[in-house]
Amino acid sequence: MKTKNRVWYILFIVVGSVLVISNSCKKDNPTQSVIKLSAVTDVDGNIYGKVIIGTQIWLTENLKTTKYRNGDLIGTTTPAELNIYDEVTPKYQWAYDGDEDKVATYGRLYTWYVITDTRNICPTGWHVPSDAEWLTLENYLGGYAIAGGKLKEIGTTHWVTPNYMATNETGFTALPNGWRHIEDIFVNFAKFGGWWSSTEYTATDAFCNYVSYKSDLITEEIDSKKCGIAVRCLKDQ
């Protein structure tokens, strides 16, 4: 039976971080405390928020870095639409459609070979989540059929209409970053948001998760490791 629960947004002042206190109500299980914590910085100097969801701590934005954790540059293609189908293990990052102005809001897109490179791309103390860790998030939020709505940013500032059942009650703030096919095109900007997992399916494919403007699902899919897909980092435990 579904019950109404109160969720507390606990935002407090700590050294170097200023946060605000309020509370509101939400429906459906599971309920949770949304605690916005002090910021995280990547090797490029990009700053990210972080949020507790169940037993996990997630960044609240997609990764934007152009470097591995050790400072090595991650390659890209010129032009952004270059066909990489025949490359064996391409390691690239892109702004969507080659438009650097989109990076601040939507982050970058990476091939799977980048996100599993031993040099790491998440900030120190963070990692690209496995398929099992995505499933932990999904289950905590009540299952795949409703979890997507709880992750998506509210409204149509970034999402196309109707952005069905978006509540962002988790503070995850999923945005429709689209993705890059292995041939030469960028697709589904403003309609779908997706993120890699570190778990491979076969030698050529890996698991990823998507949310859509037209449903409140979170959908596990299998894509080519050569695709450009966003990354949302998870804190090490």
Please state what every model-predicted region is.
Residues 2, 26-27:
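Beta-rich interaction/scaffold domains
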Residues 2-11:
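Bacterial N-terminal signal peptides that target proteins for export
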Residues 21-24:
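C-terminal motif of bacterial Sec signal peptides marking the signal peptidase cleavage site
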Residues 27-237:
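Conserved positions within compact, well-structured domain cores
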